Amino acid sequence: MGHLYRFVEPVLLLVLKEKGRSYGYDLLRSLGEHAFTDGEIEKAVLYRTLRRLEQNRYIVSNWDTGAPGPARRVYALTKDGEKHLEEWAQVLAKVADSMKRFVRRASSGSFSSHYERSSV
């Protein structure tokens, strides 16, 4: 039911905090497990978000050439990234409260009873 691309950033930060270091394909798979969406996250969204996080110095990357096969870019969280994740946690706590209120109101049937009263 739709993509919440805005939340790719905090999920990436959390995954990197938990894993320490990770590469693109592994992050994409982890996003699917942790994301706030029922759809797949597009690769372009992942890499755009990683670039932005790196430009803002929330993550760093380097090329891993030690493993067999082609070199892979490996990402890691910085201290600034940890602080940014904490900020996201505070924002998401407020969003969660708002969502709970929304769900409660939307599922209470209050709209139909209000509509019926106002149409009389």
Task: Give the label of every model feature segment.
Residues 2-45:
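N-terminal helix-turn-helix DNA-binding core of bacterial DNA-binding proteins
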Residues 61:
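Short beta-strand "wing" residues that participate in macromolecule-binding interfaces
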Residues 83-120:
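Amphipathic alpha-helical dimerization/coiled-coil segments
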